[in-house]
Amino acid sequence: MMSGQELAEVVQIAVEDLHPGHHPVVLENHEVTEEDLSPTLKRQRIEINCQDPSIKSFLFSINQTICLRLDSIESKLQVLEATCKSLEEKLDLIMNKQQNPVQVPVVAGSPLGATQTWNKVRCVVPQTTVILNSERQTPGVTKLEGREESINSSTETLENMLNSAVPGRRHNTIVVKVPAPEDSHNDDDNDSGSEASDTLSNCGNSGNPNMGNNVTLITLNSEEDYPNGTWLGDEHNPEMRVRSPITAADMLHISTNCRTAEKMALTLLDYLFHREIQAISNLSGQGKHGKKQLDPLMIYGIRCHLFHKFRITESDWYRIKQSIDSKCRTAWRRKQRGQSLAVKSFSRRTPSSSSYSTTEGVQNTVSSSSDLQQTSPQALHYALANAQQVQIHQIGEDGQVQVGHLHIAQVPQGEQVQITQDSEGNLQIHQVHVGQDGQVLQGAQLIAVASADPTAGVVDGSPLQANDIQVQYVQLAPVAEPSATAQAVEPLQSALQPEMHIEHGSIQIQ
């Protein structure tokens, strides 16, 4: 028989087995001893024996995913570090590059040029990388400024270069890579410069490390350069436009008649560069014949205009540049053979580059007549109808364009005054009768011959410039028949010249 104490212990053990999570129930007659007190809580020891393969594969996949993430982060950091180093090297190249500008003569305008930019020297065909002035820097330069102090100093030096190279009225500067001199060593009939300049247009994708050592700046012009000109490119985008001396009437004529991008490019080339300039120049300014470089700003303007008007691609622009260089080579060969370099389309029409303005400032468009086609192709022709001022462009022996104005005090109603400038620089003033339909009724009659007087005068209270000419006449001579026009030119010239005298710096006809 069990004793009472043993029986109580057995019952206590049975109760504990039934309620493992609860405190043991102590019987009333059970005496609590030290052995009955529960030991202090200890960390449960669990023996891990993972024999399930699914748990192992799950843990392995988690480990593999974490490793892949870490590898991806590491590769991105390496790419970022390489990009920062590349940008730092480019900034160092820009900072250390010292380009001495070479003056490139450019005669621009219609028909034989309207401006001469000797003081605006820029480099070759630009690309899409643009750095604005200090107020609007590119985000890449701004980020680099916050990275290291050395890059900060490089950026400040670059900004100083921009400010020193750009006059106060200019705002945008383009960073351009230029082909090295050793890149162009073919003869002139084969090298066009377009291959090198095409590399410039795509220098962001180029892997040639030698191209990175030739960097220069191109300064975009503003409306102040050519107040009477027009924009090439998108006039609403200051980074994709160039101010040109082409007038609005000429630009309308070009846009109307040029249906393809290549034809428009070659037409704009004739308006912007005289054939004499084309003959001694090309796009790259390199070659064995010592050719000069076409004004890269105007070439960039042509590029912007074609991209804006025709949505051309870089491959199209590469082909057009080859055509431009081919046109320059053709002009060079014609000059070597002694052939004429005149633009036929310009000699058959009245140039709209001349400014026709009335006293109220209204511009009038004058249509060309058949008489203008019969005159010498060496002379510049201007027709004036119901206006009081005509602008004269004359190209000097040095290639400079001299601009003057011819002031006429009064024009008889229903008549036109045709001003012809001969090869010697003298002005021949003719009277032309024009019908209501715009047709010339009778041939032009020479009424005066005048030369420019550098002395200043006054016309209606406005001072004359140095190259201005004032012609006053009270009564015009009777108009001769068309058949007798040629015979009447010389007698009229000799008869009218004694009646001309200079008074207060102006040439007057009595």
From Swiss-Prot:
GO terms for cellular component: nucleus. Residues 348-359 have a biased composition (Low complexity). It comes from the Eukaryota. This is Protein BANP. One of its GO terms (molecular function) is DNA binding. Residues 68-100 form a coiled coil. It comes from Xenopus tropicalis. Residues 178-212, 343-371 are annotated as: Disordered. Pfam families: BEN. Gene3D superfamilies: BEN domain. It is found in: Nucleus. DNA-binding protein which may repress cyclin D1 transcription by recruiting HDAC1 to its promoter, thereby diminishing H3K9ac, H3S10ph and H4K8ac levels. Promotes activation, which causes cell cycle arrest. Keywords: Cell cycle, Chromatin regulator, Coiled coil, DNA-binding, Nucleus, Repressor, Transcription, Transcription regulation. Residues 193-212, 360-371 have a biased composition (Polar residues). The keyword Transcription regulation applies. Transmembrane segments: none annotated. GO terms for biological process: chromatin organization. The keyword Transcription regulation applies. Residues 239-335 form the BEN domain. Its main location: nucleus. PROSITE patterns: BEN. Belongs to the BANP/SMAR1 family.
